[in-house]
Amino acid sequence: QSDLTELLAANNVYTGDLTINSASTLTAAEAQGGKLGIVNGNVYITQSSTAIDAAKLQTVVSKIVTVIGAVSYTHSGTGVTGVNFDKLTGAGSIKLDQEAPVSLSSLVSVGALEIVDDVKITSIDLSALTSVTSFNDGTTANALGGSKVTSIDLGSLPRYDVAAGALTLELSTSGDTTLDLALLTTTDNSTGLVEKLDLTVTGGDDLSLPLFVKGDISATNVKSLVLPKFIYTASTDGTLAVTASKLESI
């Protein structure tokens, strides 16, 4: 144990929980410098006042690359500028409850990912994500997005494996919206077999699922739907329901 402690101390590793909820705790976090590259613990950040300097907080957050435990970020308040975990590549779990667009553009792997639905979230960038245990929008399991979201980028995600075999993605029903699911397959990560994934999508004007094979698809408010490999069976393993109010091509 002593050898491990010395090894962690010699590298860019912070051991223990990192809590930032005031100007003084932010100052303490700044003093850790590069040791925040890997947090061997949890990260708890509450930003609800301009007393916490947003620029300084962003500098600290941008040092965090890997969190062994949980990341919890709460952001609210008039005039309070939110921060992004722009360098975070992996975490045990993440919960974001913020009043601003979500950018986790470097995130590759995470356990449970909860992004609480809020009217001020207009975009969700998970463009590097390749592995996630589950999504949650704060009230519903296996759900991501919200009524004001105009863009969701899951362009690197190859599979969503949950016992429920279901995923719900919600975007705004007005204006132009984009949804990137370019690599989403219905192949089980562990067995390599094609397994059913029920996908419910609201929005995503030009919805393309080039690798999606098996499951029930429900699409609302889409203009075009591309399913080159989808096996339609008109049964419980391959139904297709499309609300045609904006549909131009399928």
Regions found by a protein language model. Name each.
Residues Q1-A9:
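Extracellular/surface-exposed low-complexity segments
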Residues A31, T59-I64:
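Beta-solenoid repeat scaffold
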Residues N12-T25, N40-A51, S62-N84, G90-P101, ...:
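Concave beta-strand-loop units of leucine-rich repeat
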